[in-house]
């Protein structure tokens, strides 16, 4: 059950209504997480959507971005984002079994993605500055400085929705995912 106010889409007005209309046109529905964010802080919803649009134009592929989304959402314990992003990861080319691997912080048959999910899980779980060795290992896997910054951008975007959903206990409106 939601802990934060979430207006029904039909009752939204102003910026929230416009954002909800745009989201519905793009994805066919307004996910509960977006209803909650838009009901309480439409400017933040707009910013989050804009950030994700910018990241969609980055040098990171959809496959890489969805690997980050799954690894970070598992690390932070966000069941909602795992349910939302698992089908997107499948659409980006992962099998169901691979989505489970990504959530556990590895990918057996792709060294680059394996390095990516290990890096982002370390980034989210470690306290303080990452060691030069960790950053060098990520670069050695083929990631540029620009891609490191873009990776941090994807982590930032998914952590925002992870935190909203963990505080709100947002009702999941996607197919449930397997526990690991």
Feature-to-residue mapping (PLM):
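Hydrophobic alpha-helical segments
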Residues: 1-180
């Amino acid at each position: 059950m939601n802990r934060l106010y979430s207006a029904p889409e039909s009752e939204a007005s102003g910026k929230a209504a416009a954002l909800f209309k745009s989201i519905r046109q793009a994805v066919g529905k307004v996910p509960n997480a977006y209803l909650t964010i838009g009901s309480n802080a439409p400017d933040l919803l707009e910013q989050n959507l804009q950030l994700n649009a910018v990241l969609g134009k980055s040098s990171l592929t959809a496959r890489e971005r969805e690997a980050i989304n799954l690894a970070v959402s598992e690390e932070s314990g966000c069941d909602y984002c795992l349910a939302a992003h698992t089908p997107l990861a499948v659409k980006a080319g992962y099998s169901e079994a691979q989505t489970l691997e990504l959530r556990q912080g590895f990918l057996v048959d792709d060294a680059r993605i394996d390095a990516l999910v290990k890096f982002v899980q370390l980034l989210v779980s470690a306290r303080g500055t990452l060691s030069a060795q960790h950053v060098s290992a990520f670069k050695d896997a083929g990631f540029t400085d620009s891609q490191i910054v873009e990776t941090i951008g994807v982590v930032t975007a998914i952590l925002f929705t992870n935190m909203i959903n963990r505080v709100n206990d947002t009702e999941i409106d996607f197919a449930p995912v397997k526990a690991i």
